UniProtKB/Swiss-Prot annotation:
Organism for this UniProt entry: Drosophila melanogaster (Fruit fly)
Tissue localization of expression: Constitutively expressed at high level in gut, in addition to the induced expression in fat body.
The protein's name in its UniProt record: Peptidoglycan-recognition protein SC2
Disulfide bonds: 57-63
One Pfam family here: Amidase_2
Family classification: Belongs to the N-acetylmuramoyl-L-alanine amidase 2 family.
Gene this protein is translated from: PGRP-SC2
Length: 184
């Protein structure tokens, strides 16, 4: 039985390494618990990309500060149940858990129930994506497919395609339009 557990752990570790995704849990970054949660279906057809339009962070410590500030704003000022996004990606190349898997976000009106929301920390009208961020985002999307959160033929949108906004910023917009699942 112990051998089976070790094999399972090794498989999970290798799967994470193959996808190149390290997800920093909400508890690890000091996030608050959601006041409520709505389940999100599996095999969704869409992923929506955002930017937070705030400060850029390039270290784990700085990204944690940004995450805590964004969550406080979303919960305390906007009255939302939690941080709006399912996942966020810092300039340090880490993926940070927001609402996480299988929980409906509050990131794109009329699209929350049919998409996952992924946001980059920073303002990408002025900031530029690093190769680590691009790798993390693509790895996270691959992970979402392998987990059954989104279908393999999912459609990738920038927030501006589903709402009246500049989000996800010009620099992210120009990048994601080159990705295979992006649709005009």
């Amino acid at each position: 039985m112990a051998n089976k557990a070790l094999i399972l752990l090794a498989v999970l570790f290798c799967a994470q390494a193959v996808l190149g995704v390290t997800i920093i849990s909400k508890s690890e970054w000091g996030g608050r618990s959601a006041t409520s949660k709505t389940s999100l279906a599996n095999y969704l057809s869409y992923a929506v990309i955002h930017h937070t339009a705030g400060n850029y962070c390039s270290t784990k410590a700085a990204c944690i500060t940004q995450l805590q500030n964004i969550q406080a704003y979303h919960m305390d000022s906007l009255g939302w149940a939690d941080i709006g996004y399912n996942f966020l990606i810092g300039g340090d190349g880490n993926v940070y858990e927001g609402r996480g898997w299988n929980v409906m976000g509050a990131h794109a009106t009329n699209w929350n129930s049919k998409s996952i929301g992924i946001s980059f920390l920073g303002n990408y009208n002025t900031n530029t994506l690093t190769s680590a961020q691009i790798t993390a985002a693509k790895g996270l999307l691959s992970d979402a497919v392998s987990r059954g959160q989104i279908v393999s033929g999912y459609i990738l949108y920038g927030h501006r395609q589903v709402g009246s906004t500049e989000c996800p910023g010009t620099n992210i917009w120009n990048e994601i339009r080159t990705w295979s699942n992006w649709k005009a």
